[in-house]
Amino acid sequence: MSKHKNQRTARTLEKTWDTLNHLIVISSCLYRLNLKSIAQIALSVLAMIISTSLIIAAIIFIISANHKVTLTTVTVQTIKNHTEKNITTYLTQVPPERVSSSKQPTTTSPIHTNSATTSPNTKSETHHTTAQTKGRTTTSTQTNKPSTKPRLKNPPKKPKDDYHFEVFNFVPCSICGNNQLCKSICKTIPSNKPKKKPTIKPTNKPTTKTTNKRDPKTPAKTTKKETTTNPTKKPTLTTTERDTSTSQSTVLDTTTLEHTIQQQSLHSTTPENTPNSTQTPTASEPSTSNSTQNTQSHA
């Protein structure tokens, strides 16, 4: 049936193309004869035919595709039915003893049913089978225990991400261009490297600073010594004043006279009986006589 439909569709498409070719030839002839109105009508009809033919062809292809899909689903269902029928026929033909023997290694329930009817030899076999099953279960539990160990190894996989991040840090700034993110990454690399160098530099810097501080201190000490020596020079002025004019010497004599007068007044107030009082005027009298002689010489 599908072959006949495909042949029909092919024939209809051929007929439509033939009619389209004839209409194109007719429209060209009408243009040559200057019958534009008739040519326009023919072209409109041609467009309608083309659109209808395309729609018909699309519908036909869709139907054929759906028919193919239904055929595939039918074939799959038929295959399943055949397999199920074959299995059922095989089970009906095979005796139940073979079926039970085939099921014994998988399940333990048929073992107990047979143990009631069989001899003690068969019971021992059943014990062996149960022991084997128990051994399998124990081995399975033992195999499950080491499975927990690799789980502990999974967490150390995190540093791999850090390693990739470190590799990403080594980005040359020449590649960045105008990308601000790339520039920010490039700035972090040099900022981290020089941090290690200043740890060595501060050890050398203090040595230079101490030498610079000691140099300016030495002239300061010399200046202090000079200030101490200045007061010693002041008494020299007194020596120079003695060699000056006579007017200055008279002033000094008057000062000495005043001192002597004060001493005499003090001696006059002291009692005469004390031995100290008798001795003091003897010491003071020559001083007064000397002072008077000096005044006369100057006069």
UniProtKB/Swiss-Prot annotation:
Spans within the Extracellular topological domain: 67-299
Official protein name in the record: Major surface glycoprotein G
Membrane-traversing stretches: 38-66
Keywords assigned by UniProt, alphabetized: Disulfide bond, Glycoprotein, Host cell membrane, Host membrane, Host-virus interaction, Membrane, Secreted, Transmembrane, Transmembrane helix, Viral attachment to host cell, Viral immunoevasion, Virion, Virus entry into host cell
Top-level taxon in the UniProt lineage: Viruses
Disulfide bonds: C173-C186, C176-C182
Signal sequence annotation: none
Motif Microbody targeting signal mapped to chain: 297-299
Ranges of biased composition (kind: Basic and acidic residues): 212-227
GO biological process: symbiont entry into host cell; virion attachment to host cell
Compositionally biased residues, Low complexity: 129-147, 200-210, 228-250, 287-299
Organism: Human respiratory syncytial virus B (strain B1)
Gene Ontology CC annotation, any one: virion membrane
